[in-house]
Regions:
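Helix-to-loop junction immediately C-terminal to a conserved catalytic motif
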Residues: 48
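Conserved ABC transporter NBD signature motif
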Residues: 55-63, 72
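Conserved ABC ATPase signature
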Residues: 107, 132-136, 140
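Catalytic Walker B motif of ABC-type/P-loop ATPase nucleotide-binding domains
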Residues: 157-161
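H-loop/switch region of ABC-family ATPase nucleotide-binding domains
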Residues: 192-193
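H-loop (His-switch) and adjacent beta-strand-loop-beta switch element
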Residues: 205-218
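ABC ATPase nucleotide-binding domains
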Residues: 229-254
Length: 254
């Protein structure tokens, strides 16, 4: 369980998050939604310990600030929305997922190498292992970065809009990989901007608007929540049409 209590974040005196209190159960799939500038990415970074905050973040009942680097790596893996594209091969990048567990020399053990191979296989990256990262398409690179996160072998995976810049086919492939990880027991917490996609893949949602948590709960409950319309000027409804891409659709409000 990841627990947040009274989380506040400010940048230059301007509040980005205001008194956010919520929790993310072990083994859940949660999407964080909200309008641009609502605080979604800031919340994810605070949970990962990458943004200064006031309040308390607890992971497995332990204050995040009290966890060692290795203990934190066992609990949380974080994939930001924007990443560099270093001039290295795919195997090396995936191996970086093991670095938080290693000593100063960053020498991989047999267990580390096995986890790297398993992560590549699981994410469909095994055929890419010998290729340079800069040679890959956007969808291939995103799978490789996800493989790096999987190789870290953390209990919870935090992802900031992982489907950004991907075409529909690669989005669906990525979501299928995340669902596979979720079924295997990983906790998935994902920032998403596509409402039908978020409502369709998540078991629970958190709505941030203006840095404030305005609603939370399962998709069918949030469909009717007035905070959704206030945030987006639109609402979400179940979509049972057989040719629909997702189980929910966005509808305009009068």
């Amino acid at each position: 369980m990841i627990e947040l209590e009274h989380i506040c974040v400010s940048y230059g005196g301007t509040p980005a998050l205001s008194d956010v209190t919520t929790g993310f159960p072990d083994g859940g799939f949660t999407c964080i939604i909200g309008p641009n500038g609502g605080g979604k990415s800031t919340l994810l970074r605070a949970m990962a310990g990458l943004s200064p905050y006031t309040g308390t973040v607890r992971v497995g009942g332990v204050d995040l600030s009290g966890l060692s680097r290795r203990d934190r790596a066992e609990q949380l893996a974080y994939l930001p929305q924007s990443r560099p594209i270093p001039d290295i091969d795919v195997r090396t990048l995936i191996s970086h997922g093991r670095f938080p567990h290693l000593g100063f020399s960053k020498t991989l053990t047999a267990k580390d190498r096995t986890l790297v191979e398993e992560a590549a296989e699981r994410t469909g990256c095994a055929p890419l292992l010998g290729r340079r990262l800069r040679e890959l398409s956007g969808g291939e690179r995103q799978r490789v970065y996800l493989a790096m996160v999987v190789a870290q072998d953390a209990r919870a995976i935090l992802l900031d809009e992982p489907c950004t810049y991907l075409d529909i086919r690669h989005q669906l492939e990525l979501l299928a990989l995340l669902e596979d990880l979720h079924r295997s027991g990983r906790t998935i917490i994902m920032v998403a901007h596509d409402l039908p996609q978020a409502f369709s893949c998540a078991g629970s949602l958190r709505l941030l608007d203006g840095g404030v948590l305005t609603a939370e709960g399962p998709p069918f409950e949030l469909c009717a929540h007035p905070a959704l319309n206030r945030a987006f000027g639109a609402s979400v409804r179940p979509d049972d049409r057989p040719d629909s891409l997702y189980r929910f659709r966005t509808v305009s409000m009068p």
